[in-house]
Structure formats: structure tokens, C-alpha cells
């Protein structure tokens, strides 16, 4: 799904680094997968993949399964990790993350 945007080796390394529950931090993950240095267009493409229901927002249930976008066998985020991730990205407080909020969080 991320072919041409992200390197498989970077994804594998990023997933390995947060395999244990409670070890996921979005900033570290975005850095490890090489997303921070990508163009706005590429970040928007990644957002489109994570936005499973194509609502133009990433909601809490989609964040919980965030890692599974990168590998089907990856774990779900814990409730605490999901809440922290949502809070970090939801700058307008509407309970979901839009594409501009996502881009700001990635670049953060």
C-alpha cells in the first residue's frame, strides 16, 4: 500500500521498535518510517490509506488499528497509546484527525 512512498525496511524497523505494548510514540514512528521528510502529497497519500472508511478523517477506531496499515500482523495500539495519539493530532478538539492535522503531526 505504501510502495513508492515508504521503504519496506523502514516500515519493518519501525514496527519492530514498537512491538511491545506501551512503546508506540507517533513522532518516533513517523521518523523511523521516513515520513517526516516526505512531501505534502506523499503525507496526504499515507493519510488516505490510514483513513480506512474514507471519511476524510482518522477516527479513534482507525488510530487503534494504525500499525496494521503497515503490516497485517502488527498489534493494535493500547487504549492509552490511542488516546495519546488522538490528543496529539486533534488540534481542533473534534475527536478526530483531519489531513491537515495529520500533516502537522507528522512534521511536528
UniProtKB/Swiss-Prot annotation:
Modified residue annotations for N-acetylalanine: 1
Protein name stated in the entry: Parvalbumin beta 2
Residues binding Ca(2+) 1: 51, 53, 55, 57, 59, 62
Species of origin: Merluccius australis australis
Domain EF-hand: 38-73, 77-108
Misc. remarks from the entry: Is regarded as an important allergen. On the 2D-gel the determined pI of this protein is: 4.30, its MW is: 11.30 kDa.
Keywords: Acetylation, Allergen, Calcium, Metal-binding, Muscle protein, Repeat
CDD domains attached to this UniProt entry: EFh_parvalbumin_beta (cd16255)
Paired cysteines (S-S): none
One MF term in the entry's GO annotations: calcium ion binding
Function, as annotated: In muscle, parvalbumin is thought to be involved in relaxation after contraction. It binds two calcium ions.
Family, similarity comment: Belongs to the parvalbumin family.
GO CC term, one of those recorded: cytoplasm
UniProt-listed Pfam families: EF-hand_7 (PF13499)
Chain positions recorded as Ca(2+) 2 binding sites: 90, 92, 94, 96, 101
